[in-house]
Swiss-Prot record:
Protein name: Small ribosomal subunit protein uS3
Glycoprotein in keyword set: no
Domain (KH type-2) ranges: 39-111
Organism, scientific name: Acholeplasma laidlawii (strain PG-8A)
GO molecular function per UniProt: mRNA binding; rRNA binding; structural constituent of ribosome
Amino acid sequence: MGQKTNPNGLRLGIIRTWESKWYADQKDVPALIKEDALIREFLNENFSKAGVSQIEIERVKAKSKERVTIKLYVSKPGIALGKEASVKNKAVSTLEYLTKKEVILNIIEVRRPEKVAVLVAQSIAEQLENRASFRRAQKMAIQRALKSGAKGIRTLVSGRLGGAEMARSEGYSEGRVPLHTLRADVDYATAEAKTTYGILGIKVWIYHGEVLPGQSILDTRKPFEAGNQKRGQKRRPRNDQPGQRPQQRNRNSKED
């Protein structure tokens, strides 16, 4: 049977970049990879309610000791920061104790969580754990993603759907999701929903557009704006022609 490869790994080095950015001697690479996994596991567990979508790790070797810079992308920055940044400061102190290095944690807000595959998959998983219909959860996620500017989305839920004795898979698709086009910016993520009748697997593919030569992946994931109207620009009435002043209507005048 033909299997589908991970779209994120397939495009790595072509239109996507690495989430861990550092160089080290060959003897130090295994320890640093293990340390990266420890940092990601800690952040995902402690900031799970904040909606973590991506974690980027950069390492710089300073004179005194190594410095680790972490970019944490979340959909709810208020929960990640806490009152007077108490949650963030506590996480930084814990990471410095675990790694024995200087840690800088930058929390970045995700403006459109409706079209981020990781957050969409987590949202569907939470709804399934709360006994929501798997069909309704997928359809609502598709509608929100398309409304936020995604050009295509595909979802798939597998397991004992509805408590059935035999496991099966059921998914929905809307728009275009070109998996074989390497310049296509396809965001992919998985999640698990732990229900009373077993674990359900969720897969989400979201297509943001093509990354043309000279562009980056950030050009296809700009914040969505309704129509062609720019921020701060006033909308022109339909009946008025460009370059003409809109006709004012007198409310006191009576028509024959």
